[in-house]
A protein has these predicted regions:
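Short, solvent-exposed positions on alpha-helices
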Residues: 28-32, 50, 71, 93
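Charge-enriched, short contiguous segments at helix-coil
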Residues: 71-134
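Charged, alpha-helical scaffolding/interaction elements associated with membrane systems
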Residues: 23-24, 62, 86
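Charged alpha-helical initiation segments
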Residues: 1-27, 132-133
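Hydrophobic alpha-helical packing segments in soluble, helical-rich domains
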Residues: 29-46
């Protein structure tokens, strides 16, 4: 994924490590990395407010994610906690779902937005005057 903003460069190394863990069949490390990366993204956007849960709430309230994305991010938080605290071993499908959500958030915040701003849209032609009804 091509990250094109200076802000995104702050977590690009972590993103590379997540993909390295994925490639090397290390799903626990990848899920923990995704959780860490998403928290970094939220802190960059809304500032540091302590907990992932508080970051997520404020991130949503600031309009960065929809209700559906909010719920998905909450599940990713739980998956990260389950890996760390409950011995959760994500399947390839689990990891794929986590990566899909992460990539969607990053793309929406750092790729699509910039790409859309760079569209070369021609100006609208002037409107013809309406014929008088007389």
């Amino acid at each position: 994924m091509l990250l094109i903003s200076d802000e995104a460069s702050k977590f690009e190394d972590l993103l590379d490590e997540i993909y390295t863990a994925t490639t090397n069949n290390l799903p626990r490390l990848a899920v923990m990395g995704v959780r860490a990366l998403l928290e970094q993204v939220m802190i960059l956007k809304i500032g540091d407010h302590g907990s992932f849960g508080e970051h997520l709430k404020l991130f949503h309230e600031a309009g960065y994610v929809s209700v559906i994305q909010f719920d998905a991010l909450a599940r990713i938080l739980d998956a990260g906690h389950a890996v760390i605290h409950r011995g959760f071993a994500p399947t390839k499908g689990d990891l794929s779902a986590v990566l899909d959500v992460m990539e969607g958030i990053i793309a929406a915040l750092y790729v699509h937005d910039q790409n859309v701003k760079n569209l070369k849209i021609p100006e609208r032609p002037p409107r013809r005057p309406e014929p008088s009804k007389g």
